[in-house]
Amino acid sequence: ELIGKGFKDDGKGGNARKGIVWVARRIPDGYVSAHANQARITTFPKDDPENCLYSPDVISFAREMGYYDGPDADFSFSDAYAPLDFGGMRACEARVWAFFRTVADDMDRYTDYAMGHNKNNRMPLWVKPRAKVSPKTLFDCMRDHYEGTPMDMTADLGAGGHNCPYRWRPMEFEVDGVKYVNERATATQQTGFWFVAQARPDVTRDMGILWFGVDDAATSCLTPIFCSAQEVPGCFREDNGSMLEYSPTSAFWLFNRVSNFAYMRYDMIAGDIRKVVDKWENEALRLVRDVDAEAMTLSPKARGKFLSEFSIATAQQLFDRWSKLDKY
């Protein structure tokens, strides 16, 4: 975790306070962690470089800025540089809680923390999952709307007649002098692209995968892009349309159109989309295993060409499949 030092005028129109302060902790083997725009590292070991590294001025700079005045041993990165408040818990840490709750046991004891009611009941930095977390499980964690929790976005009044798990901004609003809040779930409508990076120790270094998708994670799909790919698939190209310029060959615009259609009758449409998503992603995971076996027999140069062609072709197949869904 890191934060910039802010601006201090050097008298010449420049910044005399450059750089960042940071802490990095190694996640223990067999555990998982998560992060959602709120610092989570509190106290940390100062003499264990195998498992924790930090900038040399991480504590002294906090003292200089008046953020901390206690002993070094008790220094908490989050409490100094990003103190918890209601928004940090409800809009950020709640998303971490939703992930932890999906993969690990006994996370409901932190419900009051996730809802922003009890910052003293802070979640651990990492948790031990009940089973090995598969790529598909992680894909689906990105689609969460707090289903089955007190913050379930399909179940309150704002969901309307079709159980829509989205609340158009702002997140906070006031009625008759009373302030209310909309949830900020993991899956959200203002998504340009999303991905899951998969580092794999059982294949060569050029065979890592970026599972890549566009628009809302809950109503879109991931496709494998190998890290040795030498060309961007046409449907994902930066010059193929833009946020302000529609393109019929752009995956973003295609997925965005399907998602917006689903928002109107979510309970009737989202389930059909999810069937296509699950079928595609499960088949892609299986197909990657077959591709791995063939790629491992090739020279590095030939392998790069082979995996690049596979990534491009698969992305186009996804685009074609979504075009059919768009007309369904």
Regions found by a protein language model. Give the residues of each.
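C-terminus-biased signal that marks the final domain/tail of proteins
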Residues: 2-328
